[in-house]
Amino acid sequence: MSDEQKKPEQIHRRDILKWGAMAGAAVAIGASGLGGLAPLVQTAAKPSKKDEKEEEQIVPFYGKHQAGITTAHQTYVYFAALDVTAKDKSDIITLFRNWTSLTQMLTSGKKMSAEQRNQYLPPQDTGESADLSPSNLTVTFGFGPGFFEKDGKDRFGLKSKKPKHLAALPAMPNDNLDEKQGGGDICIQVCADDEQVAFHALRNLLNQAVGTCEVRFVNKGFLSGGKNGETPRNLFGFKDGTGNQSTKDDTLMNSIVWIQSGEPDWMTGGTYMAFRKIKMFLEVWDRSSLKDQEDTFGRRKSSGAPFGQKKETDPVKLNQIPSNSHVSLAKSTGKQILRRAFSYTEGLDPKTGYMDAGLLFISFQKNPDNQFIPMLKALSAKDALNEYTQTIGSALYACPGGCKKGEYIAQRLLES
């Protein structure tokens, strides 16, 4: 089908959305919590029949890299961004020391003390995951550009330590960004195979940040693979993440994800995290033909195979798929990133009455200017998928390397 033939149909789809839109007031949601007034107490794990099973669900916290990046993709995510309100770097150091202690405890399956001598103080632990396994819990921290510099002024004496590629992602033609759905001085990505375990971890981390940071946004996502480990599917029903390289290949991960040199010392073993909250127009998509859907992606919906091939993992032949398809444009750049996306649903959009759902796109790369942004520009300019999606949140974060026992996350940055 020619571009001239497609154009009226594309306008019609956009009009559907416009006709369905209604004026609505913006709703601001604030988050707050009670800080821990008593020191954190760790209890020894009691032997039980569940011990062996729980050990299999523990992702090590300490290491060269932070967990939650090349870790096997979990089912649930809570993704939060915070703005720092503290004026002194010492407060930030205290926060990251506390966060490290809590994260190490929770990811290893240990519990905070259930006993509390003073009943007139808030409980140390909110308690909702007390009887649950660690469920492959991981917590990943990152820093936004505003952590280092704000309104042209150095913050905490760390401007000289700002990573060289850390800046707000450039705005794209199809963006409709809400500043409260992107950005932030600090990000926290909490992943687990049990939603309640993930929520509990984030809730207690945010409680510890009261008085030091304000919550900017919190997103909840999910993504389930098949029974036999098949590639998960997004809300459009297509396989999501087929092009990812094996995270078990250290050489590949060093070439795509992990920073070894050329950045401030604290970024060694770290990476950059790109975040895009992408709204999907599900009602319009659901009324599109299977042919249009497959032409949009450049893959078969059922098998995930690229056009002209039989299997999902077969190589893409660019001359056999539409030039404006999502796969064609992503592959034509020759760039590689590590995708770690999740779907989200947030009820109904009060402005349109349609379902408020989409994709929490998260990717990791060692050089966003060379890897992610060229791909983003190519997709934003011509991607047929843009007819069915709109980005409403955007951010780029620098994730420090991991830490050893006795250290805390970002120590090389905060004590440099």
Curated annotation (Swiss-Prot):
Entry GO terms, CC: cytosol; extracellular region; plasma membrane
BP terms from Gene Ontology: iron import into cell
Consequence of gene disruption: Severe reduction in Fe(2+) uptake and in cell growth under anaerobic conditions but not in aerobic and microaerobic conditions.
PROSITE patterns per UniProt: DYP_PEROXIDASE (PS51404), TAT (PS51318)
Residues annotated to bind heme b: 241-243, 326, 339
InterPro entries, per database record: Dimeric_a/b-barrel, Dyp_perox_C, Dyp_perox_N, Dyp_peroxidase, EfeB/EfeN, TAT_signal, TAT_signal_bac_arc
Subcellular location: Secreted; Cell membrane
Free-text biotechnology note from the record: Catalyzes the peroxide-dependent oxidation of various industrial dyes contributing to their detoxification and thus can be used for the bioremediation of dye-contaminated wastewater.
Key words of the record: Cell membrane, Heme, Iron, Lyase, Membrane, Metal-binding, Oxidoreductase, Peroxidase, Secreted, Signal
Keyword check for Lyase: yes
Signal peptide positions (record): 1-28
Molecular function GO terms recorded: ferrochelatase activity; heme binding; metal ion binding; peroxidase activity
Annotated function: Involved in the recovery of exogenous heme iron. Extracts iron from heme while preserving the protoporphyrin ring intact. Part of the iron transporter system efeUOB/M involved in iron import. Catalyzes the peroxide-mediated oxidation of Fe(2+) into Fe(3+); EfeM binds Fe(3+) and delivers it to the cell membrane permease EfeU.
Subunit-structure text: Component of the iron transporter efeUOB/M complex composed of EfeU, EfeM and EfeB; EfeU is essential for the complex formation.
Protein name: Deferrochelatase
Origin species: Bacillus subtilis (strain 168)
Originating gene: efeB
